Amino acid sequence: MSASQQSRTSIFTPVLIGGSLILLINFALRASFGVFQIPIASEFGWPRAEFSMAIAIQNLAWGIGQPIFGALGERFGDRWSIIIGAFLYSAGLVLTAYATTPASMQLLEVMVGFGIAGTGFGVILAVIGRAASDENRSLALGIATAAGVQ
């Protein structure tokens, strides 16, 4: 076994576990928004359509952010994409707790959507794919993908 193969083998398991945990947390939080739709809408007296629009905007920002964070990862390294994405996601979630109008909620969901793009499948699976050997790549990508799909 060459030195590069040994290095790849030694980092494979932590990368797979770390990437899977990022995806698990990322998409578990994202999926929980639906649980809070009715309580938040009734608490603030918003129509449910306003909260639904915020989630739709989040999905749109996630889609727009995917190629941006992919390019960021290629140019500056995946670590920076993940760090920036995690910061945006965390800041967006914290600030969303203080949103008192539908417009502020919708605006903050743009930040959350970009955060999801930076910590989502595109960036994380690229890191795991590079860390895995040719023989283990399909299994590793399957495990990580399953972690992100609740």
Predicted regions and their residues:
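Conserved MFS/SLC helix-loop-helix module at the cytosolic interface between two early adjacent transmembrane helices
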Residues: I64-A103
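Residue-level signature of mid-helix packing/kink "hotspots" within the transmembrane helices
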Residues: F27, A31, N59-P67, T119
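Helical-face signature of the major facilitator-like transporter fold
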Residues: G19-F27, N59, L93, T101-F114
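Cytoplasmic helix-loop-helix junction between adjacent transmembrane helices
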Residues: L108-A146
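Extracellular/periplasmic helix-loop-helix junction of adjacent transmembrane segments
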Residues: G34-I64
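Cytosolic juxtamembrane N-terminal segment immediately preceding the first transmembrane helix
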Residues: M1-I22, N26-F27
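MFS transmembrane alpha-helix packing/gate-lining sites
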Residues: Q58-G65, G92, A147-Q150
